[in-house]
Structures are given as structure tokens and as C-alpha cells.
């Protein structure tokens, strides 16, 4: 008889996940050639766990572009969000990116703060047995330390196999789920149209 899966939450740092996916794609293939399914990605992570878990909530944090400046990219972002919302476990917390006219690029503003708050409040909420942060961004070390050491839900990490990261707590027994190319195949579909990465 198998044990009943315990409730977990997945906190996704979207652009870090998209940036890191290239570490499991064939060399030279950009991240905008695959479309990630957040629900299936959570299920892949749950299957890798050393105990039965289920993700009751999946929160995707992302910055979005200016719809007036880049309407096609904005439409692509909104279509992606609508697809993810087909899974009732998924919620998206988006914040407007700041456009830098000197570099013609966007910069995320407030997304990292929202992720850190989500990690810490979810860990302490009493609603989950565990919270998994899918990111390799070392800027989250202070929030990770707080959430990992606080009483309440266990905290774990997820990232792509081979994705460079300094997001770690030396000397601690912090569990990390490493997703490889086979895992990517289970939680993505090829994307033949213009992407956002």
C-alpha cells in the first residue's frame, strides 16, 4: 500500500527557468523553441521526490513587457499565461518589466522580491508540507536561508541539470530536484512560433 502524497507548493522563477532550460537542450537550440507546461513540470518534480508528494499550488512569477511597445511579445506572454491557467493549480503573478531604451531590453522589477515573499510566506503558512523553489538565482540565498531554517514546511530546490547556480546553503541537507532532457520532454512541447525568451 502506498502512502498518501503530502501537499507541496511549487514557486517558479520563470525567466530563470527559461534561461536555464538551454542546459538540457541540444547545443545552440534557444529556450524559445519549447513551451513549458507548468502542471506537467510540477508532476515531473513530484515523481522525482524521495517520498509521495503532490503539488496543490504552482505559482509562476514573471515580468511582462510593455503591451504598447511590444504588442506581439505581450500577446505571446498572455497566450502562455492562458495556457498555464488551464491547470487549476497554476496562478501567475506578473509584474511590469522596465524597458531600458539604451540597451533595448527589459529588466525585471519586483519579481525577485515577490518570489522571496512567496517562498517565505508559503513555507510558514501551515498549508503545505513542503515548498519547492525552481530557480538557480543566488539572489534568493537570504530568503532560502530564512525559509529553510524556519519551523514549518520543508524547503527544496529544483533546477535544470547542468544549470550553473550558486543558490545553495553550504553545510545544510537541502534537497534539489535536477531535471534533465528526458524530464523536459515530459513537460514541454516544441514551439514553432515566435517565443518570448
Residue ranges and their predicted role:
Residues 86-197:
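Nuclease catalytic cores that cleave nucleic-acid phosphodiester bonds
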Amino acid at each position: 500500500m502506498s502512502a498518501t502524497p503530502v501537499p507541496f507548493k511549487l514557486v517558479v522563477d520563470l525567466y530563470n527557468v527559461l534561461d536555464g532550460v538551454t542546459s538540457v537542450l541540444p547545443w545552440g537550440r534557444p529556450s524559445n523553441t519549447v513551451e513549458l507546461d507548468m502542471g506537467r513540470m510540477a508532476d515531473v518534480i513530484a515523481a522525482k521526490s524521495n517520498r509521495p508528494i503532490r503539488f496543490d499550488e504552482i505559482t509562476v512569477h514573471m515580468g511582462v513587457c510593455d503591451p504598447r511597445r511590444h504588442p506581439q511579445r505581450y500577446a505571446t506572454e498572455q497566450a502562455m499565461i492562458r495556457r498555464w491557467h488551464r491547470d487549476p493549480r497554476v496562478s501567475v503573478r506578473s509584474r511590469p518589466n522596465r524597458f531600458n531604451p539604451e540597451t533595448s531590453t527589459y529588466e525585471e522589477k519586483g519579481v525577485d522580491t515577490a518570489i522571496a515573499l512567496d517562498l517565505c510566506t508559503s513555507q510558514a503558512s501551515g498549508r503545505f508540507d513542503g515548498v519547492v523553489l525552481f530557480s538557480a538565482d543566488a539572489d534568493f540565498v537570504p530568503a532560502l536561508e530564512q525559509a529553510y531554517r524556519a519551523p514549518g514546511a520543508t524547503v527544496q530546490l529544483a533546477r535544470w541539470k547542468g544549470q550553473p547556480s550558486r543558490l545553495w546553503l553550504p553545510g545544510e541537507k537541502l534537497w534539489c530536484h535536477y531535471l534533465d532532457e528526458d524530464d523536459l520532454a515530459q513537460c514541454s512541447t516544441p514551439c514553432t512560433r515566435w517565443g518570448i525568451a
